[in-house]
Amino acid sequence: MEQRLSLVTLGVDDVSRAQAFYEALGWHLGGGVDDETDHVAFFQAPGLILALWDRGKLAHDSGVTDTGGWGGVTLAYNVRSPEEVDAVLAEARAAGATIARPGAATFWGGYSGVFIDPDGHPWEVAHNPGWTVHDDGRTTLD
């Protein structure tokens, strides 16, 4: 297996609402399925695709039970400066997110905070001085 992550699918309660939230953050819808039986939204990001799909349908498709609780996964959005962490957290709050942890210095020498999207998915917004966020959005380990 080649080392690669192609798609992250978030199970959501209301795909239209979740889509509107990510569009309010500046993400651009790249496609999807929208018919009488299903609604899936796809956003192209550098190096991977983010999908939004009904939580129950995703659980069924994955062969697991939807417990509605935290699944032990946190998403991360790396930025170029500590100031950008605070700006992104403010943008997320304005779009409808809850701030779980405001921006603060970390034990590993960076600066990060966490917002929770409307469906309960935690997003860490982080500046790591040892990583590079390139102009095309890729993040690399230095």
Language-model features, listed with the residues they occupy:
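N-terminal beta-strand motif that seeds the catalytic metal site of vicinal oxygen chelate
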Residues: M1-Q19, T74-Y77, P129-D142
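Hydrophobic pocket/interface hotspot
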Residues: A18, Y22, V85, A92
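Generic detector of contiguous secondary-structure segments
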Residues: E2, G31-F42, T106-G113
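Short, flexible, glycine-rich and Lys/Arg-enriched loop motifs at helix boundaries
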Residues: G56-G68, T132-H134
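Core segments of cupin and vicinal oxygen chelate
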Residues: T9-A59
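Vicinal oxygen chelate
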Residues: R4-D13, A41-F43, G63-D142
